[in-house]
Amino acid sequence: MAPTGGGTLAAVHPIERLRYVARASGVDQSLLVQETASALGAFGADPAGMVTACRRIVHRHPACGALWWLCGRVLTAGDPMPEAWRAADEIDADRTAVELAHALPDDATACVLGWPDLVGEALPRRGDVEALVVDVLGEGSGLVRRLLAADVEAVDVATQGLGAAAAAADVVVLEASAVGPDAFVGVAGSRAAAAVARHDGRPVWLVAGVGRLVPQRVWDALSGLVDAAAEPWEADDELVPLALVDQVVGPTGPQPVADALKRTDCPIAAELLVDL
């Protein structure tokens, strides 16, 4: 990927691009990383400005593990911009959705919440799988329409049916926006779905793509910001113990949790760990 390559905001000035990224919500992590990498190009000759820009981005999107990963790589690199583009290329080449599509059991019924980026990319590849899509944050209905258009059997489940859907599924497939050493950030309802599945003996798979696993110090800062964003019962995201997860699906396929955590590769940039 070249710094001058096309993108959704290719003709926009980098400063305006950065403002867009900071304001964006409901945008998938891949796009956020690509647009942030491009926007940071405006600060190539301004190290202090780059630090401030990175801090503002991760504080605006604290649940986005891939942005912490990108900004950590940029701020700890000897040559920041080539590192930013390498990170964007790695996100673009992420095989997690492909591996998830391959790994799902034949003719399985999968319970998913909302419209997760990678899960939503994987399911249309599997016409034999039925999806019970819980309409969390009002996003599930859109995924159901997408799946039906791809000839994938899908059921639009109201939020009050979350527990029943988790108990009825062959596998509960959750997606992490960030993963720490002992917990992950998932969409609201993830903890309840995982707990019901565990109680009923259903496997819980956690989907965590490139850049979403972070070390303890970064996790402490990230999870603290997520916790402080809203009252727990009003938040769009929540912290879920990894003890409720059976397998983590990443770019090399499903792994036990302990093995998956070994691919944590987010650098620790001290500049990101202080309050704005």
Where do the PLM segments sit?
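Long amphipathic alpha-helical segments
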Residues: 3-86
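Buried hydrophobic packing segments
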Residues: 36, 40, 119-123, 143, ...
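Short helix-capping/linker segments at secondary-structure and domain boundaries
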Residues: 43-49, 78-79, 128, 200-203, ...
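Long amphipathic N-terminal alpha/beta scaffold segment
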Residues: 51-52, 56-128
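Conserved phosphate- and dinucleotide-binding cores of soluble alpha/beta proteins
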Residues: 136-276
